[in-house]
């Protein structure tokens, strides 16, 4: 293994319960419930029309600009106190000590990624940031971002390991031929992460050496020989 590829939201830090509560409150203010099952379909994806779902429930059009502004204000306030998930800084330190490459592979916009890795105190040491910048054709669960990350780092799929918290992210890594460690949070722990090669419930006390040993010992191997990566042309990405 030469490189580790990390999802951001829900993996390196965990804003998911807060974001779910914010949207749930909006639904409740309009007389409806945003169920956990409906929210599970949103996690790790982009382009899902939550306001469209709310309009269907209420039977009327909503001022989406007002709703977006309300959600943005609450996110600005409530996410400001969050830091990296416990154990994440230590795992990144172990990654650097082992001489491994690392990149962020996230569906969030680059500006969001930069802001919150800085807030979490983990902004240093990344070789690159990979974001679809709102393009659903490049976003997880498609393998595009992972193939882009592999090409940028110059590593083959079997030389990388991904860390993800959601089914969408795990599927994206799997489709790119990258072995995956599932590190679910409270919002994703009950979801189907069975495509992952390894599951850990917490980063606290995690030894990278042990994780990599268990990954290498898994009888399931990435079936991508790298040809898909070679055939997949990628645009320039944003590098820290």
Model-assigned labels for residue ranges:
Residues 32-34, 60, 122, 154-155:
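Helix N-cap/coil-helix junction residues
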Residues 24-27, 46-61, 116, 149-150:
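Helix-loop "lid/cap" segments that line or gate small-molecule binding pockets
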Residues 33, 53-93, 98-100:
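Metal-dependent phosphoesterase signature
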Residues 1-40:
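Active-site neighborhood of HAD-like aspartate-dependent phosphohydrolases
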Residues 1-2, 93-96, 100, 110, ...:
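Asp-based, Mg2+/Mn2+-dependent phosphohydrolase catalytic module
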Residues 12, 84, 162-163:
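Conserved SAM-binding loop
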Residues 11, 106-108:
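Conserved phosphate-coupling serine/threonine residues in phosphotransfer and NTP-handling enzymes
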């Amino acid at each position: 293994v030469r490189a580790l590829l990390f999802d951001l939201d829900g993996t390196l830090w965990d804003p998911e319960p807060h974001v779910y509560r914010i949207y749930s409150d909006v639904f409740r203010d309009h007389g409806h419930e945003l169920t956990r099952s409906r929210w599970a379909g949103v996690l790790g994806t982009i382009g899902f029309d939550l306001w469209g779902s709310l309009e269907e429930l209420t039977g009327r059009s909503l001022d989406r600009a007002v709703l977006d502004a309300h959600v943005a204000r609450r996110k600005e306030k409530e996410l400001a106190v969050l830091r990296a998930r416990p154990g994440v800084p230590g795992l990144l330190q172990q990654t650097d000590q082992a001489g491994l490459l690392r990149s962020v592979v996230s569906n969030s916009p680059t500006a969001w990624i930069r802001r919150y890795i800085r807030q979490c105190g983990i902004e240093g040491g990344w070789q690159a940031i990979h974001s679809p910048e709102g393009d659903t054709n490049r976003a997880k669960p498609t393998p595009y971002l992972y193939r882009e990350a592999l090409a940028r780092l110059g590593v083959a799929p079997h030389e990388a390991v991904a860390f993800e918290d959601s089914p969408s992210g795990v599927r994206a890594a799997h489709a790119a031929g990258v072995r995956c460690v599932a590190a679910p949070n409270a919002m994703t722990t009950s979801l189907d992460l069975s495509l992952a090669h390894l599951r850990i419930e917490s980063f606290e006390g995690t030894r990278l050496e042990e994780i990599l040993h268990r990954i290498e010992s898994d009888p399931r191997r990435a079936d991508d020989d790298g040809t898909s990566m070679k055939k997949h042309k990628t645009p320039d990405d944003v590098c820290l």
